[in-house]
């Protein structure tokens, strides 16, 4: 399972909206009560634009909390109704941009974010959503500019977290971690929603895990669960960590809990890999079948898992032709580094190593420190008999995070040893011939 920044892209992959409408509501009220509150207001006055905006905001929050995309559909209806009544409501336009983003409709998200900025150029969150959409299509310089503008307007949990993500993409992991720590502190001071703070704590844990720092990752995941009990992202993150610690029974239990809350294909695949690792193939197969079932069902509900399925198929050497088609389809609307990585991995698995090399070089272009990227690069160069580069990237994968996957980390180590032996053998033979 890949839980590093922006890899978990199934339903919602970025922080939510910085603020809601200026309507009085009791501090700490549950999201369900907020939804009921705004619905009650609309019963009294069906043309209350702010109430529709508030309802849309609450529905988005609910979607983030439980991962149910239907709440985004309901939020879209409420926000469009708000804009029909009050066309210049920048907040509603910004929230609508976020709904489009959640569905991976990145062009529509960017368009609506720009409209929101035209209505209110001082709204930092609109710049944040614009940056998110630009990031997903690989426009990194434009995304960075949007995030920097957001930061100029507001030093918040949301702006800090986004800048942290940009730093992580460019390999500045220390800067990313520092920004996330500051984001959490700022978020707590501003009494931001618990889910937003928990998301940031989970992301901080994921950044530590990506560097193989298990104690810090554990601390962050546990804190995320304390902030927002049963938070599915933190449960899955802790499950991955327990697997790295070889505490497999605990990892299985945690993944099962996360899947019960939100059945994401990444989680089911990761659980299946643990079963495979500990010699329980029948249960592994059940989870792998669940991955495909989730993918089919989600497609019917217009939730796209092309990337997740393409990684899953390639990782497990099944449906490789279909998998490559899914990966290449990603490039039709997403051109971030992981779109190129999933294409590279699938080209490699389909025996097209030369093409895979071109794609993996694009995936590595920002200098992102991701063991999974390095592993893919190492295996691709290995297949091309580029021994030096293969050794370099496999070694980087293991030095970056020796726990990056319960199965593939061992594969990387074995491939690296094989390469080192072959190089040593070639050296001995060369000396013999020279003598």
Each language-model region and where it sits:
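Flexible helix-coil transition and linker loops at the boundaries of alpha-helical arrays
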Residues: 39-48, 81-91, 185-197, 294-301
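Register position in tetratricopeptide repeats
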Residues: 61, 68, 102-103, 136-137, ...
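TPR alpha-solenoid repeat register
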Residues: 51, 92, 126, 159-160, ...
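Canonical tetratricopeptide repeat
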Residues: 54, 95, 129, 162, ...
């Amino acid at each position: 399972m890949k839980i590093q920044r922006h890899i978990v892209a199934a339903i919602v992959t970025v922080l939510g909206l910085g603020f809601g409408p200026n309507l009085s509501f009791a501090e700490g009220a549950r999201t369900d009560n907020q939804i009921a509150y705004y619905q009650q207001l609309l019963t009294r006055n069906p043309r209350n634009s702010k109430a529709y905006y508030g309802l849309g905001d609450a529905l988005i929050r609910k979607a983030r909390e439980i991962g149910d995309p239907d709440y985004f559909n309901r939020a879209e209806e409420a926000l469009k109704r708000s804009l029909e009544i009050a066309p210049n409501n920048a907040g509603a336009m910004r929230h609508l941009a976020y709904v489009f983003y959640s569905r991976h409709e990145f062009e529509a998200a960017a368009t609506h974010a720009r409209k929101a900025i035209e209505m209110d150029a001082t709204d930092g969150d609109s710049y944040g959503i614009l940056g998110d959409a630009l990031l997903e299509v690989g426009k990194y310089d434009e995304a960075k500019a949007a995030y920097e503008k957001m930061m100029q307007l507001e030093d918040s949990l949301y702006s800090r977290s986004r800048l942290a993500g940009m730093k992580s993409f460019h390999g500045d992991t220390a800067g990313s971690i520092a920004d996330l720590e500051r984001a959490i502190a700022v978020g707590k001071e501003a009494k931001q929603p618990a889910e937003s703070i928990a998301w940031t704590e989970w992301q901080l844990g994921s950044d530590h895990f990506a560097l193989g720092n298990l104690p810090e990752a554990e601390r962050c995941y546990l804190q995320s669960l304390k902030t927002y009990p049963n938070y599915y992202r933190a449960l899955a993150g802790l499950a991955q960590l327990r697997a790295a610690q070889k505490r497999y029974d605990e990892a299985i239990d945690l993944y099962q809990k996360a899947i019960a809350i939100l059945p994401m294909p990444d989680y089911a695949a990761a659980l299946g890999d643990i079963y495979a690792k500990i010699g329980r193939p029948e249960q592994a197969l059940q989870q792998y079948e669940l991955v495909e079932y989730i993918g089919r069902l989600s497609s019917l509900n217009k939730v796209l898992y092309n990337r997740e399925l393409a990684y899953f198929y390639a990782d497990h050497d099944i449906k490789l032709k279909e998998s490559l088609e899914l990966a290449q389809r990603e490039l039709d609307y997403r051109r971030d580094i992981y779109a190129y990585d999933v294409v590279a991995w699938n080209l490699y698995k389909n025996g097209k190593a030369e093409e895979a090399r071109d794609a993996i070089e694009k995936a590595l272009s920002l200098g992102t420190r991701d063991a999974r990227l390095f592993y893919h690069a190492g295996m691709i160069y290995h297949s091309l008999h580029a021994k030096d580069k293969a050794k370099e990237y496999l070694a980087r994968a293991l030095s970056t995070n020796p726990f990056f996957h319960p199965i593939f980390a061992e594969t990387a180590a074995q491939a690296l040893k094989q390469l080192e032996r072959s190089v040593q053998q070639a050296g001995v033979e060369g000396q013999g011939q020279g003598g």
